[in-house]
Regions:
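Positively charged N-terminal leader segments that act as targeting/secretion signals
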Residues: 11-49
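Hydrophobic faces of well-ordered beta-strands that scaffold small-molecule active sites
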Residues: 65-70, 101-105, 137-144, 174-175, ...
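Conserved, mostly hydrophobic/aromatic
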Residues: 73, 176, 232, 284, ...
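Terminal or standalone catalytic/regulatory effector modules within metabolic enzymes
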Residues: 95-113, 348-356, 360-566
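Active-site beta->alpha loop and helix N-cap motifs at the rims of alpha/beta catalytic domains
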Residues: 107-220
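Catalytic cores of alpha/beta
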Residues: 216-220, 271-283
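Glycine-rich phosphate-binding active-site loops on the catalytic face of alpha/beta enzymes
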Residues: 236, 285-300
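Acidic, low-complexity mobile loops and tails
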Residues: 552-606, 613-618, 622, 627
Length: 650
């Protein structure tokens, strides 16, 4: 504890039609990291006479901290996350910037996409967190509660292991949220996270509906705090939270729970985020999530420079930014985009849109939604042409979809539009557009995941299910449930231990490899077999080809692609054999994957001549395979190009 003498200039009051701005001195008894409601003031007589209630005074000067949500920046922009080597390069630059108390390092949409890229997420998290820890920066992860790090429910024993593993790897804070705001899906995680030594930050998924009121959110916050939550995050995942409500919610939580740290997470898509940040800070928020260029703004997050400038000029105590380090982090992020991550980024995610306010869909899913909409549009227009009706443009379809989401959302119980329930709600609306065009009506094409949300298998939706859907469920023999979702699952770790033992796989440090298999079984198996890396490199090459092909002719694209590559030419006529058996037991022989590395003089392939001899074809000067022109078993003539290998950089 310490006393600090402070002078605040912007003390604003309003009483009737009279307003005043006063300067005064006061002492505050400051306890480190406590919110303002813990400070006791001793103002001058004029101020004390004017204000009987300190809450009527707008106090400027509260300390605000910032988190860099680097993981979510990438998730909201595209498909993949930076590799371990890239994260290790940029982490010290975040430290050098000097303005971040926290960095979001991992969690949902990090570990899984690492595996999809053929990378080990455990190694990445450990290496990434280390320099941040050494500098005193706290690390945090995204945690989907019942679904943990994936899109469907996870057994209790796997969820418990997750917190032990992630804390051992260097993650300090877990941000636990549930897409339905069902506290039953969050409360067990609070206990397990704290037992593992982590800070349990629980999230309120913010949206706008007649159900999602101030009272609704404060009740959930009370329940989570009573269950042991250390912090509260206002997770404004679509950026549609109204600033006034967010300010009132922040104040309501702080008034009742002054020790609780409040962190605000918003997206910039609909354009409300800066106003929301100002409101929550003026009402007691402690930490604000921010981004950096070139991935800030659009449908992602506000940039730290703008947020810090706004709050500083409002009178808050904020850190300075080392702009040289900011520009270094900006350049490195752009380098990562240019190297490969940009091929999986949808350009539309850089565009803000007020249309998001109407439907409430999160910005991060707009890219995939537009792709889905394009496919449905073609089918709908074929139907309309047969009926002699005008075709619909993409803009027409977008307005129709947003209107249908507004129709569907209340009827399925107002689930907060966040993963995975935003996808389910959007898909119901999309299928409705198609079936209505076919003359079949609504709610005809719904899969098990959509019904699971409606029936309560993932938790309780906030609102009432429409009677039409209740009746439809009865007709189809479906049953509603109010059971606690996590009690419907059986423990699974023993089965995964058995699988690892049978394969001769190590459990890994702190059982981290066992955890990855249990959390992402299919992706982990593909990672271990090498298939994930093959698939990823093929997808990357296809994305590069598509981007290049959109700008130039096929001939120009080929010339550009082959500029740094050596053509592997057949010296004889014959049949191509890339290999004589597959890469693994019982796998058929096939051509290699795009991206495979060769050293100078390595055997590249074989050609069986018409006279029965096998000609060994070397890999020229070596490098990376970028194109295959002859499949396994095809016939080639002398002089035909078999493939291209890109030479390594000098």
């Amino acid at each position: 504890m310490r006393f600090i003498l402070c002078k605040y200039k912007r003390i604003i009051t309003k009483k009737g039609d009279e307003a005043g701005v006063f300067d005064f001195f006061y002492l505050i008894l400051q306890a480190d990291e406590l919110p303002f409601s813990h400070y006791f003031t001793h103002s001058n007589n004029a101020a004390r006479l004017l204000f009987k209630d300190i809450n009527t005074i707008k106090i400027m000067g509260k300390k605000i901290q910032f988190s860099l949500v680097y993981r979510d920046m990438w998730q909201s922009s595209g498909k993949f996350q930076p590799r371990k080597d890239q994260l290790v390069r940029i982490a010290p630059v975040f430290v050098e910037m000097g303005c971040f108390a926290r960095v979001e390092t991992n969690g949902g949409a990090f570990e899984q996409v690492c595996l999809l890229a053929g990378e080990n997420p455990n190694e990445a998290v450990r290496a990434y967190c280390k320099p941040l820890h050494e500098a005193g920066i706290k690390t945090h992860m995204l945690d989907r509660g019942l679904n943990a790090l994936r899109m469907y429910p996870v057994p209790d024993d796997v969820r418990q292991l997750m917190y032990k593993v992630k804390h051992a790897q260097g993650t300090d804070i877990t941000r636990i949220f549930d897409g339905l705001n069902d506290v039953r899906n969050i409360i067990p995680s609070i206990k397990w996270a704290k037992e593992a030594g982590m800070t349990a930050q629980t999230a309120l998924c913010i949206t706008n509906s007649p159900i999602h009121t101030l009272e609704y959110y404060t009740k959930i916050a009370d329940e989570l705090i009573a269950a042991g939550a250390d912090e509260i995050c206002l997770k404004d995942m679509a950026g549609i939270g109204q600033p006034a409500l967010l300010g009132k919610l922040t104040k309501a939580i702080k008034d009742k729970h002054p020790d609780i740290i409040i962190e605000y997470h918003g997206h910039s898509g609909p354009g409300l985020s800066m106003a929301s940040i100002l409101e929550v800070c003026n009402n007691g928020a402690d930490i604000i999530d921010t981004a950096i260029e070139p991935l800030s703004w659009g449908k992602v997050h506000p940039d730290i420079i703008s947020v810090l400038s706004m709050l500083k000029n409002e009178g808050f105590d904020v850190p300075e930014i080392n702009m040289n380090a900011y520009m270094k982090a900006r350049a490195l992020t752009q380098e990562f985009i240019d190297e490969w991550l940009g091929y999986f980024i949808n350009p539309s995610n850089k565009i803000m849109s007020s249309l998001l306010l109407g439907c409430g869909l999160p910005g991060g899913m707009m890219g995939s939604m537009m792709a889905d909409l394009g496919g449905i549009r073609q089918t709908i227009n074929n139907l309309r042409k047969k009926k002699g009706e005008d075709e619909l443009t993409m803009d027409d379809m977008l307005v129709k979809l947003f209107s249908e989401v507004e129709y569907v959302w209340p009827r399925v119980g107002y689930p907060p539009l966040v993963t995975p329930f935003s996808q389910y709600t959007k898909n119901i609306a999309l299928m409705n557009l198609l079936t209505m065009e076919q003359g079949k009506g609504r709610f005809v094409m719904m899969d098990e995941s959509m019904w699971g949300m409606i029936l309560g298998k993932s938790g309780k939706v906030p609102g009432a299910i429409d009677p039409e859907l209740v009746e439809l469920a009865k007709k189809q023999g479906r049953e509603f449930t109010d059971a606690d979702p996590h009690t419907l699952l059986t423990n699974a770790l023993d089965d995964f231990r058995k699988e690892m033992d049978e394969n001769g796989w190590e459990y890994g440090q702190d059982d981290e490899e066992l955890f990855e298999l249990a959390m992402h079984p299919e992706q982990y198996r593909n990672y271990r077999s090498g298939q994930a890396k093959k698939n990823f490199l093929a997808d990357l090459q296809a994305a590069k080809d598509a981007k290049l092909g959109a700008k130039v002719s096929p001939e120009e694209a080929a010339a550009f692609k082959h500029a740094k590559a050596d053509a592997i030419v057949s010296p004889v006529k014959g049949q191509i054999f890339w290999e004589f058996q597959g890469d693994g037991e019982a796998l058929k022989a096939t051509e290699p994957f795009i991206g495979k590395e060769y050293k100078e003089g390595d055997t590249f392939c074989y050609i069986c001549t018409p006279w029965g001899e096998f000609e060994t074809i070397p890999a020229a000067l070596g490098g990376q395979l970028v194109e295959i022109n002859a499949k396994q078993g095809t016939k080639v003539n002398k002089g035909d190009v078999i493939a291209y290998i890109q030479r390594p950089e000098a």
